[in-house]
């Protein structure tokens, strides 16, 4: 259940359901036919992470901790986003919560560091997650596409 705590804010965010339409004028994408798609495209991230991002943009001084689904209808999904005030004394003095006051945790939601954001990054253990070995898709790609010519080879 809900419990009011000092330094914590709950935002209820409404996100429109469905896929993402490519924002092009009159459907003119230009280029090869393989990239002509406009309508049946799917966004790479979840609607929950979109909700977190919007809450984080709206409340720039707060830090996004996490979020959860609260309901949906035919048009919208509703999420509640937990935000923390990093300058509230109750947060700064509590050893369990003062980690989020550090500058490195600014805008976690924009960088895919929340639970919902991490799910779309392909991180994990085992043979199903080989494309993110090294921490990210980019790190794995860079390592596999870099030619190392050692002095003694």
Swiss-Prot record:
Q: What species does this protein belong to?
A: Sus scrofa (Pig)
MF annotations from Gene Ontology: RNA binding; structural constituent of ribosome
State what this protein does: Component of the large ribosomal subunit. The ribosome is a large ribonucleoprotein complex responsible for the synthesis of proteins in the cell.
Record key words, sorted? Cytoplasm, Isopeptide bond, Phosphoprotein, Ribonucleoprotein, Ribosomal protein, Ubl conjugation
Q: What does the record list as GO biological process?
A: cytoplasmic translation
Q: Which cysteine pairs are covalently linked by disulfides here?
A: none
Q: What is this protein called?
A: Large ribosomal subunit protein eL15
- Site of the Glycyl lysine isopeptide (Lys-Gly) (interchain with G-Cter in SUMO2) crosslink? 32
Looking up SMART domains in the UniProt record yields: Ribosomal_L15e
PANTHER family xref list? LARGE RIBOSOMAL SUBUNIT PROTEIN EL15, RIBOSOMAL PROTEIN L15
- Please give the InterPro entries that the UniProt record associates with this protein: Rbsml_eL15_core_dom_sf, Ribosomal_eL15, Ribosomal_uL23/eL15/eS24_sf
Compositional bias segments (type: Basic residues): 118-131
The cellular component terms of Gene Ontology attached to this UniProt record, alphabetical and capped at eight, are:
cytosolic large ribosomal subunit
Q: Where is this region: Disordered?
A: 114-135
Tell me which family the UniProt entry assigns to this protein.
Belongs to the eukaryotic ribosomal protein eL15 family.
* UniProt subunit comment: Component of the large ribosomal subunit. Interacts with IFIT1 (via TPR repeats 1-4).
């Amino acid at each position: 259940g809900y419990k009011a705590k000092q330094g914590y804010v709950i935002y209820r965010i409404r996100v429109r359901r469905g896929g993402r339409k490519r924002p092009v004028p009159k459907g003119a994408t230009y280029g090869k036919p393989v990239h002509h798609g406009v309508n049946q495209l799917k966004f790479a991230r979840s609607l929950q992470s979109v909700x977190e991002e919007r809450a984080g943009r709206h409340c720039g001084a707060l830090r996004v901790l996490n979020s959860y689904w609260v309901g949906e209808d035919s048009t919208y999904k509703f999420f509640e986003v937990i935000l923390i005030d990093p300058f509230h004394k109750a947060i700064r003095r509590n050893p369990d919560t003062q980690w989020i006051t550090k500058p490195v945790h600014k805008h976690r939601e924009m960088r895919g560091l929340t639970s919902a954001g991490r799910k779309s990054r392909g991180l994990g253990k085992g043979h199903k997650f080989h494309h993110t070995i090294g921490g990210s898709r980019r790190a794995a790609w860079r390592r596999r596409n870099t030619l190392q010519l050692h002095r003694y080879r």
